[in-house]
C-alpha cells in the first residue's frame, strides 16, 4: 500500500472527500524507487481500469517527470466529489492498494476549476 502524504497537511484528501463539489480533478503525485517502476505501472494500469468503469468517472492521464527518478502525476476528472468518494472507498479498490510497491508515496488532492478573467473559464 502506498504511503499517503498529503499535499496540504491541514486539509488532506480525507477532509476534501467531505466537500460536495463538481466537477473535480484529482491530482495524485507519486514517488517511488526506480526498481519499483514496472510494478507501479502495472498496478496503476489495473487501478485506472477499475476507476474508468465507475459512475462519474470522466478521464485520466498519467504523466512521468523528466529525468531519471520515477515521479508520476495522475490527473483524473470526476463528475463530483461524491462520485470519486464512492469509487475511492469501494472495497474492491481499497483491496488493490496493497499491491503497490512499498517504496510508493502518493499525494492525492482534489481541485476544482476556477475562472480567471480573460485567461480561463471554470
Predicted feature locations:
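Short, well-ordered beta-strand segments in beta-rich or mixed alpha/beta enzyme
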Residues: 23-31, 61-90
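Short amphipathic alpha-helical segments
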Residues: 34-59, 92-100
Amino acid at each position: 500500500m502506498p504511503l499517503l502524504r498529503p499535499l496540504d497537511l491541514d486539509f488532506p484528501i480525507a477532509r476534501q472527500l467531505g466537500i460536495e463539489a463538481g466537477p473535480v480533478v484529482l491530482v495524485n503525485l507519486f514517488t517511488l524507487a526506480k526498481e519499483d517502476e514496472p510494478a507501479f505501472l502495472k498496478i496503476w494500469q489495473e487501478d485506472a481500469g477499475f476507476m474508468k468503469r465507475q459512475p462519474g468517472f470522466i478521464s485520466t492521464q498519467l504523466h512521468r517527470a523528466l529525468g531519471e527518478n520515477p515521479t508520476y502525476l495522475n490527473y483524473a476528472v470526476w463528475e463530483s466529489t461524491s462520485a470519486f468518494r464512492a469509487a475511492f472507498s469501494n472495497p474492491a479498490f481499497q483491496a488493490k492498494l496493497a499491491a503497490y510497491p512499498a517504496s510508493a508515496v502518493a499525494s492525492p488532492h482534489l481541485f476544482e476549476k476556477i475562472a480567471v478573467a480573460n485567461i480561463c473559464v471554470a
